[in-house]
Amino acid sequence: MRMQRRHLLKNAAAALAALGLPALPQWALAAKAVGLRRLGQPQPFDYAWLKGRARELAKAPYKSHKQVLPGPLEALNWDQYQSIRYRQDHALWADGNGKFQAKFFHLGLYFHTPVHIYDIVDGKAQQLAYDPAAFDYGKSGLGGKQLPKDLGFAGFRLNTRKDTERDFSAFLGASYFRAVGKEGQYGQSARGLAIDTGTGGPEEFPDFIAYYLEQPAADSNTVVVYGLLDSPSIAGAYRFAITNGDVLLMDIDSALYPRKTIERLGIGPCTSMYQVGENDNRMDWDWRPEIHDTDGLAMWTGGGEWIWRPLCNPPHVRFNMFVDENPRGFGLLQRDRNFDHYQDDGVFYEKRPCLWVEPKSGWGKGSVQLVEIPTVDETFDNIVAFWNPQAKPQPGQELLMGYRLYWGAQPPASAPLAHCVATRTGLGGIVGQKRSHFSWRFAVDFAGGELAALAKDPKAKVEAVLQVSRGTTEIVSARPLHELKGYRAMFDLVPPDEGTQQIDIRLYLRANGKPLTETWLYQWTPLAASERKN
């Protein structure tokens, strides 16, 4: 479906907070497992069949899957919807001896598109029936007798048998899904696809309309989930192999079948929130120093360069394209892990997971694209990053894309070079001296690699290599920062005029002609002339 992105994402972000709801009472957790009601007869199933189903779906005209919900569900407010919980005694696989269980989300509030959910056992799939008795309706005011027996589900969540109170992955709303590492704290989301994100026109949000959950073997650490995706522009078949661990791994295969030419197709989209950080938008009205799920976009290019692009909460929608060929990986990371930098003991931003996208094969020519949208609300996901193939998919074409998603405190791959640990900005000039002109100060801290040893060497000649697309730089330096066992690069940027046209900045440290750090990229919007201080 197509709709205004701000409306959908704000609702989705708030609703996904339901993933952290308190558990059911202990009597429900301890109840004997109840067999789930099923529909029809088991049918042979494999990924090839699902790809065929998606291919046939794409050949037919699109029909919306959204439905009008019964009045009581339409009328739910957030607190009422939040109180509806799936009963532990009805969990899928609760009566088995495997390591995992699945529970389901109820339709209502923002979720009007029912998804069909199937259980796969011994290569055969059978649809699970919606059962009002499987839900505790809490303070919603609803009861099973008010709802139809064929209502359907909104999505599902996965948990381990050892910890039924906390889920480690959840699929809910459009094509959104989330996961956590050992920190157990949800943060950013992924999506099956992004369509026409940042084009200036309406964005299309595909829906997963069916999920097929394969019963894991008793000793397996992996849950395999299949998804059927549909939208006005495309249909697709997905296979997720989800391996729980300190860093949760999703091994994903997708087969995409366009109905029409897509202007901007986003593969492996990451969706996050950045409101305020060390580098911009200090807010006098909020008591917390920083508010963000992630603080930067990391890229490992096909040519082997490591790039770090700090995120911003821009004054207007900002779109960046990083052209590449066969990228080795990219992702939105939360590098700042210091509680003191956030001071939020309710949502714990310092525990939010990084999300790293690793192609399983060559993706060819294209670009990593970053969209940053202004926000004054931390419940609005305003950051999106994805891979956009250079060749636009055409109707009748099959596009096969395989990749891995890693969710955890650290990405699986990192540069052998030093990496950026902080970016700070403010008014430039020399303290104590009258400013003759306006300039903006940048202080960029690097740590790791060879920097700790070089910081102790008085003969080391470390220099900042700096480029800007407009304006001039002054007071450029690179000096040891012993508190970090690293270096701080510092410079002032003087805009060329009184305009607010963006300026691109590129920086890294080197010694003896050899790079010492990853490449730091930044896009700065100069202050309006009326806001500048000399």
Curated annotation (Swiss-Prot):
Pathway: Glycan metabolism; osmoregulated periplasmic glucan (OPG) biosynthesis. Keywords: Periplasm, Signal. GO terms for molecular function: carbohydrate binding; catalytic activity. It is found in: Periplasm. Predicted to be exported by the Tat system. The position of the signal peptide cleavage has not been experimentally proven. SUPFAM superfamilies: E set domains, Galactose mutarotase-like. One of its GO terms (cellular component) is outer membrane-bounded periplasmic space. One of its GO terms (biological process) is beta-glucan biosynthetic process. Transmembrane segments: none annotated. Residues 1-30 form the signal peptide. Gene3D superfamilies: 2.70.98.10, Immunoglobulins. Probably involved in the control of the structural glucose backbone of osmoregulated periplasmic glucans (OPGs). Belongs to the OpgD/OpgG family. HAMAP family: MdoD_OpgD (MF_01068). This is Glucans biosynthesis protein D. It comes from Xanthomonas oryzae pv. oryzae (strain PXO99A).
